[in-house]
From Swiss-Prot:
Family under the similarity heading: Belongs to the PyrI family.
Organism: Thermococcus sibiricus (strain DSM 12597 / MM 739)
Keywords: Metal-binding, Pyrimidine biosynthesis, Zinc
Biological function: Involved in allosteric regulation of aspartate carbamoyltransferase.
Protein name, UniProt field: Aspartate carbamoyltransferase regulatory chain
Amino acid sequence: MKELKVSAINKGTVIDHIPSGKGLKVLEILNLPEDNTILVAINVKSQKLGRKDIIKVEGKILNEDEVNKIALIAPTATVNIIDKWEVVEKRNVEVPDEIVGIIKCANPNCITNYEEVKPKFKVISKKPLKLKCHYCERTMEENMVVKNLL
């Protein structure tokens, strides 16, 4: 018999297969409203990852920008949409080829940091993560990308 360590949700989103230790960062970048019930499991056993984190958000379906942010921090994550206690959609997150408006450029002289221009990055490499600013051509690696998520 399977043991459920984190209670099920009626309607919302489950973010599963987050690498162990990255769940709180995922939660932080999602900036969820206080009225959502949020369940977090950290460092639970996983056949796929050995250990993983899980986040369940009652009453919230993630938008594309939120899923893209998760992909930058936790590329092994899966996003499950729940309705009436059942998984109605399941998808693996994927780093897109181009990222617009969710990361601030690390170059203080970049036009995106002083004009009303949405930051835009081309993904040079997904593993390891490396992005290049469309405007100033500054490259950023994973640790800098995570620090500059909007």
